[in-house]
Curated annotation (Swiss-Prot):
Record's protein name: DNA ligase
Protein keywords: ATP-binding, Cell cycle, Cell division, DNA damage, DNA recombination, DNA repair, DNA replication, Ligase, Metal-binding, Nucleotide-binding
GO BP, sorted A to Z: cell division; DNA biosynthetic process; DNA recombination; double-strand break repair; lagging strand elongation
InterPro entries: ATP-dep_DNA_ligase, DNA_ligase_ATP-dep, DNA_ligase_ATP-dep_C, DNA_ligase_ATP-dep_cent, DNA_ligase_ATP-dep_CS, DNA_ligase_ATP-dep_N, DNA_ligase_N_sf, NA-bd_OB-fold
Organism: Fowlpox virus (strain NVSL) (FPV)
Residue positions binding a divalent metal cation 1: 288
Lineage: Viruses, Varidnaviria, Bamfordvirae, Nucleocytoviricota, Pokkesviricetes
C-alpha cells in the first residue's frame, strides 16, 4: 500500500517535536523499514531531504504569496503582512485556503499519496512562468487539506522544520549511508545499496563528490601532530575550486558547492584536458581555477573569473591547477595515499603553460623549511598554502587538510577569514540615508539549529557595489514582536530589515583585525573586530558557509599563543 502524505506529515511532526537526534533517527528508521519497497523508501528519503534533491523551484515567499493570492482571490499585500508577522508562509497559505472555500474547492480528508506529491513537485520544478505555476497548483489544491497544502509549501521551500539534516536522515536508512552519500551524492544509489546492504565505497562518474576541505592552522607543531607521515605543502592560489569529471568524450565541471561551473569559465577546456591527459579514458580531478596574467605568469585576484571582470584583463587566460586525482582509468584512488595520487597525476599529465598545470608542492620536515615558504607566499600573489599528510587518503566532506593564509602571515591576528551569511541590514545616515549600508552577519549553530549573529559589517563595498547589493538583496521589514524561529539575536542588534529567505541569503567573506569576545552576539559570544567584506562568495551557499563550530575553531586558533 502506498505511503500517504498524511502518514508522512505525522512522521515529520513526530521528528520536529523530538529533541534527541538519536530518537529522531530511530523514528525515521522505524518508518522507512516498515515493509517498504525501494520506490517508497526512495520517495520518503528524498522528501525528508528536500534541500538535497535536484528539484529547484526558484519561488520565494513573496512569489508564493502572489501565486496563491491569485488562486484564492485575496489581496497579496494583506496575505504578506501575515507572513511577516507570523514568519511562516506555509502556515499563512494553509490558513487562507480555509478562508477561500467559496472560491476554491479543497479536501476535508487527506488522501494524497507521497507519489502524487512527488509528481506534482517534479512538474512544478519544470515550469517558470507564473500562469503555468498557477495551473499546476490548481490541479493539486482540490486534493489538499489545509495541512496537506502547508506541508507541500514546506517541501517547495526545502524546509520541513524538523531540525534535522542529511546525516541523521540517512543514518535512519543505514548506519553507513551518509558516508556513501558524501562520496557519490546520488540518493537513488544510496537507497538502493542500503536496502541491499551493499554499502561499499562508491564513486560515480559525472556525479560530484563532496570536496575534501582544510581547517585553519597556526603553528608548525600543530601540523606535525596532524600529519605524522610527513608534510606536503601546496601553494594555495586565490581561485575557485573545481572538480573535473571525464567519461569517454564527455566532461562535467563542478564547483565547491557541487553545482555546475558557469560555462564561460571552462570554455575550450575539453580539448585542453584531452591534450594534457592523453591516456585518460575517464577520470575525476580536483583543482583550482584561476585567471593568469600571460605576461607575468602570475595569478590574478579572486573574482576576476566573472565575465565583466575578466574582460578588463586583456593579457590573461583561465588556468586550472590540478592538485588531486580521485579516479583514473576505471580505478578508484580516494583510498590511496596522497603521494601515490600525486604520482599518478605526474605520470599522466602533459602540462600546458598557463592553461593546465600541476600544483606546486614542497616536502618539508622542519620549522625552518616552513619559514622559507612564508617568504615566497608573502612575495607572490599567493593566498597561502595547504599542509597535507603525505600518506593521507582523500576523505570527501572532511576537514583533514590544514591551511595557513596570507592574512595571518601579513601580521593579522586573525588566523583565517570567516565566510558568513547576511542575516539582515541597517539603513545608513547622511549621504547613505535610505540605503542599506551596514549588514548583520551570522553563522548557523548545528546544535540549536538557529542562525547566530557574529558581527555588523559596514566596510569593504564601493558605492556601486552597495547599490547592487541594495537592488538584489531580498529582505523584509524586521518585526521586533515576531522574531523568526530560525534567528538567535539580542535586542541591541535588531536590524531594520531581515533576509526574507535564509536559503537565498548571500555569503560574504569577512575579515577584520582579530576575533574577539562580545557578550551581545549570540555565536558563543564570538565576534570580529573592525570587520570588512573582502569578497562576495558566489561559490558558496548558506549551507556551505562557516558554521558556529568553524567559527569556534577559528577563534581558538587565533588566540592560541605563538610557538616559541
Amino acid at each position: 500500500m502506498e505511503v500517504t502524505l498524511k502518514e508522512f506529515r505525522e512522521l515529520c511532526t513526530s521528528i520536529s517535536t523530538e529533541s534527541s537526534y538519536v530518537k529522531k533517527t530511530k523514528l525515521i528508521s522505524e518508518f522507512i523499514h516498515r515493509g517498504r519497497d525501494y520506490n517508497d523508501v526512495y520517495i520518503i528519503t528524498k522528501l525528508l531531504l528536500p534541500g538535497t534533491g535536484k528539484l529547484i523551484y526558484n519561488i520565494n515567499d513573496k512569489q508564493l504569496v502572489k501565486l496563491f493570492s491569485k488562486i484564492f482571490c485575496h489581496d497579496a499585500d494583506e496575505m504578506y503582512k501575515y507572513v511577516i508577522n507570523i514568519g511562516d508562509v506555509a502556515y499563512v497559505i494553509g490558513s487562507f485556503l480555509k478562508k477561500s472555500k467559496s472560491v476554491v474547492d479543497y479536501a476535508t480528508e487527506s488522501t494524497l499519496t507521497l507519489h502524487e506529491v512527488d509528481c506534482f513537485l517534479t512538474r512544478l520544478s519544470t515550469v517558470t512562468r507564473e500562469n503555468d505555476q498557477i495551473k499546476e497548483i490548481k490541479k493539486i489544491i482540490p486534493r489538499c487539506t489545509p495541512n496537506d497544502l502547508r506541508h507541500i509549501i514546506r517541501l517547495i521551500k526545502h524546509d520541513l522544520r524538523m531540525n534535522i539534516g542529511p546525516k541523521h536522515v540517512l543514518s535512519g536508512l543505514h548506519k553507513d549511508a551518509y558516508g556513501i552519500f558524501k562520496l557519490c551524492n546520488n540518493l537513488e544509489q544510496v537507497v538502493q545499496r542500503s536496502l541491499e546492504d551493499n554499502i561499499k565505497p562508491l564513486i560515480e562518474l559525472m556525479v560530484p563528490l563532496q570536496p575534501m576541505l582544510a581547517s585553519a592552522c597556526k603553528t608548525f607543531s600543530e601540523a606535525v601532530k596532524k600529519c605524522p607521515n610527513g608534510i606536503i605543502v601546496e601553494f594555495k592560489y586565490d581561485g575557485e575550486r573545481i572538480q573535473i569529471h571525464k567519461h569517454d568524450k564527455n566532461f562535467k565541471y563542478f564547483s565547491r558547492s557541487l553545482k555546475p561551473i558557469t560555462p564561460h569559465k571552462v570554455t575550450d577546456f575539453e580539448e585542453l584536458l584531452d591534450r594534457a591527459f592523453p591516456s585518460a579514458k575517464n577520470m575525476i580531478l580536483d583543482g583550482e581555477i584561476i585567471l593568469i596574467d600571460t605576461e607575468t605568469n602570475q595569478p590574478l585576484p579572486f573574482g576576476t573569473l566573472g565575465i565583466n571582470k575578466k574582460s578588463m584583463y586583456h593579457n590573461a587566460c583561465v588556468c586550472i591547477f590540478i592538485f588531486d586525482c580521485l579516479y583514473f582509468n576505471d580505478t578508484v584512488l580516494i583510498d590511496k595515499p596522497l603521494i601515490e595520487r600525486r604520482n599518478i597525476i605526474h605520470a599522466n599529465i602533459k602540462e600546458i603553460p598557463n592553461r593546465i598545470l600541476l600544483s606546486e608542492v614542497k616536502n618539508i620536515s622542519t620549522d625552518e623549511e616552513l619559514s622559507k615558504l612564508l617568504h615566497i607566499v608573502l612575495s607572490k600573489n599567493i593566498e597561502g598554502f595547504v599542509l597535507k599528510d603525505a600518506k593521507g587518503v582523500y576523505e570527501p566532506g572532511m576537514r583533514r587538510w590544514l591551511k595557513i593564509k596570507k592574512d595571518y602571515l601579513d601580521g593579522c591576528v586573525m588566523a583565517d577569514k570567516a565566510d558568513l551569511v547576511v542575516l539582515g541590514a541597517y539603513y545608513g545616515k547622511g549621504n547613505k540615508s535610505g540605503i542599506l549600508s551596514s549588514f548583520l552577519m551570522g553563522c548557523y549553530d548545528t546544535k540549536s539549529e538557529k542562525w547566530c549573529t557574529v558581527t555588523k559589517c559596514s566596510g569593504g563595498h564601493t558605492d556601486l557595489e552597495l547599490q547592487e547589493i541594495n537592488d538584489n538583496l531580498s529582505v523584509v521589514p524586521f518585526d521586533r514582536n515576531a522574531i523568526p524561529d530560525w534567528l538567535s539575536i539580542n535586542k541591541i542588534h535588531y536590524p531594520d530589515v531581515i533576509i526574507s529567505d535564509i536559503s537565498l541569503a548571500p555569503v560574504w567573506e569577512i575579515i577584520g583585525s582579530e576575533f574577539t569576545r562580545s557578550s551581545t552576539h549570540t555565536a558563543s559570544n564570538i565576534s570580529i573586530r573592525f570587520p570588512r567584506c573582502s569578497r562576495i562568495r558566489e561559490d558558496k551557499t548558506y549551507e556551505t558557509a562557516n558554521n558556529l563550530n568553524d567559527i569556534k575553531q577559528l577563534y581558538a586558533v587565533s588566540i592560541s599563543p605563538p610557538e616559541e
